[in-house]
C-alpha cells in the first residue's frame, strides 16, 4: 500500500477524513449510464431473475410470516413524505432543501426490520431453492408453500448456513434460515447490539461473539464454512446474490413513486441517500435504481466519520486493499450496522462508475437527527439509519455536484429519498436511550 503521506498528497480530503471531520466527496469516476453499464459484471437480467425468484417464494413467505399476508408474501416497506422533518432540517442547518423529501422505511420491513430483509432473506431463499430442486423436493412450477412441512425442515436440517455480521444481516439470515429448518450460525462483531444477539438466540440461532470488528467476524464465518462441505457461507463482502436481492427494491420503489404521482426524468431528478457499511445494501439498491432511471437518479452513500471505509476505498482507488485502521481511524461508532473498516471490493468496483458521491456524518449528528425525526414525524429509527437524512442538506449546501451536473435549474422539481435502513425491531428501552442521547446533544 502507498505510504499515508503519499496518499495525502494525492487526496487532500484524506486529512479531514483522518481527523474524523464530516466530509462531502463527489465521485470523479462517475460515468454516463450507457458507458457504465457496458462494463458492469451484473445486468438487468440478473435483477429480473432475483425478482422472479422472490415471487415464486411469496406463497411460502405469506404462510410462515403472517405479517406479510397483506402484501401476499412480498416483503416491502412504505415510502412516506416527511414535510415536517424537511422544515426542521432547513431551519437547523439554515439551508433550503430544493425539492420534496421522502423517507423509504426499510426500518419497517417485515420479518427482520431492516434493509437486510431484502438481500439476506433473498440469498437464503435462493440457496434453499437450489438444494430443494437438486434433491427433487420441489419444481419451479410448484406452490412453494409446500416447503413449510416437517419433511422439508428435516431435509434442510442436514445443512447449515453461516454469516458474519454487525447485527442486521445476522438477523435476516438467522430468522429466515431457522424458519426453513437450517442449522444457522451468526458470527457477530464486538459492536453488535445485545438485543440483536438475544433475539437471534430466541429463534434457535447459534450466535458466536468476537471482541474484534466486523472483518474478523466475517473471516471466522468463512473459515467455519470452509471446513464443512454442508455449510453455506453468506459472504457479505463478495456476494452477488445479496447485492441482487437489494437491487429488487428499485422496481418496487418505482411503483410507489408512480402511486404518489412523482415523476422522475431529466427535468425531475431523483436523489437517493443510502447508509453504507461494507456496501452490499446501498450498492444493490443504487444499482437497481440506475438500471431504471439511468442518468436521472443520483445516488450518494452515507458513512459514519469513524468508519468511512467505502469513501476511502473509492477515493484512493484501493477499494478493499485499504481499511480505515490503516490511516489511523478507529472504526468505533454507535451506528453498528455501518461499523465496517474495510469495504467490499466487489461493490466498490461495481458501483464506481454509477455512484454520484459519498459523505460522512458524526455519531452526534445521527442522534440529533434521530430525535428530530421522532419529534417531527413520530418515526423512530436506529442511529445508523439516520445517516442518509443529512444528505439533501449536504448536496444543496455543497452545490459543486449540482453545478457540475447542471441540475440547479431542475432542483425545485426534484425529489430526495432518504433510505431509512433499520429500527422497528429495536426494543423500546433501547430506542428511549437513543432518544435521550439525542436530547442531551441538542441542548
From Swiss-Prot:
Family recorded in the similarity comment: Belongs to the serine/threonine dehydratase family. DsdA subfamily.
Matching CDD domains: D-Ser-dehyd
UniProt keyword Lyase present: yes
BP terms from Gene Ontology: D-serine catabolic process; isoleucine biosynthetic process
Cofactor(s) this protein requires: pyridoxal 5'-phosphate
Molecular function, one GO term: D-serine ammonia-lyase activity
Ranges in a coiled coil: none
Record's protein name: Probable D-serine dehydratase
